[in-house]
Amino acid sequence: MTSEITYAEVRFKNEFKSSGINTASSAASKERTAPHKSNTGFPKLLCASLLIFFLLLAISFFIAFVIFFQKYSQLLEKKTTKELVHTTLECVKKNMPVEETAWSCCPKNWKSFSSNCYFISTESASWQDSEKDCARMEAHLLVINTQEEQDFIFQNLQEESAYFVGLSDPEGQRHWQWVDQTPYNESSTFWHPREPSDPNERCVVLNFRKSPKRWGWNDVNCLGPQRSVCEMMKIHL
């Protein structure tokens, strides 16, 4: 009886020791496999980040394309409108390399000088209506920048008429302004002697005086009907 008890105790102790070894082995195994699980999660996170990056990049390219297409459509529409306003053009080929073709054009019945086109009206209207007429032709009233430009214009005018230009004094304070916002330069003006002479005359015409014989600028009432000169940039094809 005594030997049986001893055997049972020994067996129990051995089983306990064996169980302890298995438990320790299992814990060690879990510790070894834990880093392996964290490593497998990193590639997934990297793939997800790259996917989001390329998705955002694709969206950015799409938005940029849409904006570009809209602007291109607006420019094309503007060019088409201008071509419809001036259905007939008179063009001169520019000096360009052989592989390039470029034409500088003015609408039919307009005068060409340097980089601009000029239309000399035969109808009389107020200064404001004259500017509106120019705007309907995608132009504005004449802005004189050089003596050469003015001399060219004078050669195409009739001495018995006066012609509105794009210079005015809206407030009557002798603060002259060009319609295209070109700064008014006192040293580059071509007023007749003793002009401008009346603060109530707020618009400017080109007219010819016989004494002395010369063309020049004269301030006049803006409502009085006069002929006019329109100006626009040349159209390049």
From Swiss-Prot:
<dbReference type="InterPro" id="IPR001304">
    <property type="entry name" value="C-type_lectin-like"/>
</dbReference>
<feature type="disulfide bond">
    <location>
        <begin position="134"/>
        <end position="230"/>
    </location>
</feature>
<dbReference type="GO" id="GO:0001818">
    <property type="term" value="P:negative regulation of cytokine production"/>
</dbReference>
<dbReference type="GO" id="GO:0002250">
    <property type="term" value="P:adaptive immune response"/>
</dbReference>
<dbReference type="GO" id="GO:0005509">
    <property type="term" value="F:calcium ion binding"/>
</dbReference>
<dbReference type="GO" id="GO:0032720">
    <property type="term" value="P:negative regulation of tumor necrosis factor production"/>
</dbReference>
<feature type="glycosylation site" description="N-linked (GlcNAc...) asparagine">
    <location>
        <position position="185"/>
    </location>
</feature>
<feature type="binding site">
    <location>
        <position position="218"/>
    </location>
    <ligand>
        <name>Ca(2+) 2</name>
    </ligand>
</feature>
<keyword id="KW-0472">Membrane</keyword>
<dbReference type="InterPro" id="IPR051379">
    <property type="entry name" value="C-type_Lectin_Receptor_IMM"/>
</dbReference>
<keyword id="KW-0812">Transmembrane</keyword>
<dbReference type="GO" id="GO:0007166">
    <property type="term" value="P:cell surface receptor signaling pathway"/>
</dbReference>
<dbReference type="GO" id="GO:0005537">
    <property type="term" value="F:D-mannose binding"/>
</dbReference>
<dbReference type="GO" id="GO:0005886">
    <property type="term" value="C:plasma membrane"/>
</dbReference>
<keyword id="KW-0945">Host-virus interaction</keyword>
<keyword id="KW-0430">Lectin</keyword>
<dbReference type="GO" id="GO:0038187">
    <property type="term" value="F:pattern recognition receptor activity"/>
</dbReference>
<feature type="short sequence motif" description="ITIM motif">
    <location>
        <begin position="5"/>
        <end position="10"/>
    </location>
</feature>
<dbReference type="GO" id="GO:0036037">
    <property type="term" value="P:CD8-positive, alpha-beta T cell activation"/>
</dbReference>
<dbReference type="GO" id="GO:0030246">
    <property type="term" value="F:carbohydrate binding"/>
</dbReference>
<dbReference type="InterPro" id="IPR018378">
    <property type="entry name" value="C-type_lectin_CS"/>
</dbReference>
<keyword id="KW-0106">Calcium</keyword>
<keyword id="KW-1133">Transmembrane helix</keyword>
<dbReference type="GO" id="GO:0007155">
    <property type="term" value="P:cell adhesion"/>
</dbReference>
<dbReference type="InterPro" id="IPR016186">
    <property type="entry name" value="C-type_lectin-like/link_sf"/>
</dbReference>
<dbReference type="GO" id="GO:0061760">
    <property type="term" value="P:antifungal innate immune response"/>
</dbReference>
<keyword id="KW-1003">Cell membrane</keyword>
<feature type="binding site">
    <location>
        <position position="197"/>
    </location>
    <ligand>
        <name>Ca(2+) 2</name>
    </ligand>
</feature>
<protein>
    <recommendedName>
        <fullName>C-type lectin domain family 4 member A</fullName>
    </recommendedName>
</protein>
<comment type="subunit">
    <text>May interact with PTPN6 via its ITIM motif.</text>
</comment>
<feature type="binding site">
    <location>
        <position position="201"/>
    </location>
    <ligand>
        <name>Ca(2+) 2</name>
    </ligand>
</feature>
<feature type="binding site">
    <location>
        <position position="201"/>
    </location>
    <ligand>
        <name>alpha-D-mannopyranose</name>
    </ligand>
</feature>
<dbReference type="GO" id="GO:0009897">
    <property type="term" value="C:external side of plasma membrane"/>
</dbReference>
<feature type="binding site">
    <location>
        <position position="149"/>
    </location>
    <ligand>
        <name>Ca(2+) 1</name>
    </ligand>
</feature>
<keyword id="KW-0735">Signal-anchor</keyword>
<dbReference type="InterPro" id="IPR033989">
    <property type="entry name" value="CD209-like_CTLD"/>
</dbReference>
<feature type="binding site">
    <location>
        <position position="145"/>
    </location>
    <ligand>
        <name>Ca(2+) 1</name>
    </ligand>
</feature>
<feature type="topological domain" description="Extracellular">
    <location>
        <begin position="70"/>
        <end position="237"/>
    </location>
</feature>
<feature type="binding site">
    <location>
        <position position="231"/>
    </location>
    <ligand>
        <name>Ca(2+) 1</name>
    </ligand>
</feature>
<feature type="binding site">
    <location>
        <position position="143"/>
    </location>
    <ligand>
        <name>Ca(2+) 1</name>
    </ligand>
</feature>
<keyword id="KW-0479">Metal-binding</keyword>
<feature type="disulfide bond">
    <location>
        <begin position="106"/>
        <end position="117"/>
    </location>
</feature>
